[in-house]
Amino acid sequence: PSPRWASVPSGFHLLEIVGYPAPDMPTGAALESRPFMVGGYRWSIQVYPNGRFPEDADCIAVSFALIQDVEHPVKVHAGFSFIDEVEKQDPRHVRTIQITHVPGNCCMGFPRYITREAFEKSEHLKNDCFTIRCDLIIVQEGLQGVNARANAD
């Protein structure tokens, strides 16, 4: 039989940081994106230049948040990457979260996305600016066993 394709709610958002603030921000302080919609849900991205938790203060942390109340947790696959230029991803720092259930008003991510030292020496930081991309794919229960093609917004 021929493969069946289903549309999967998906999209991405870019958070551009202008003026790298690491020395001036305490651990646990975040830079947050404006809200954006993927799959009919409201999301945001957070970047913690000096880590989210004291034990990770030497790292940059990234997370995404479902910023609305929901009746049931949303099943989602998420990925983060640095964007050196719009539409050009660097695969060396791509991190993904496998399918997970996200309750409303909750965030998930990577407390140790990259060490601050490695980041500050990388090509991702240019003129004290960088961009993080967050890709979200909403997993719908009825698509099990069907080849699904993600349609980026």
Residue ranges and their predicted role:
Residues P1-D153:
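Protein/peptide-recognition domains central to ubiquitin and immune signaling
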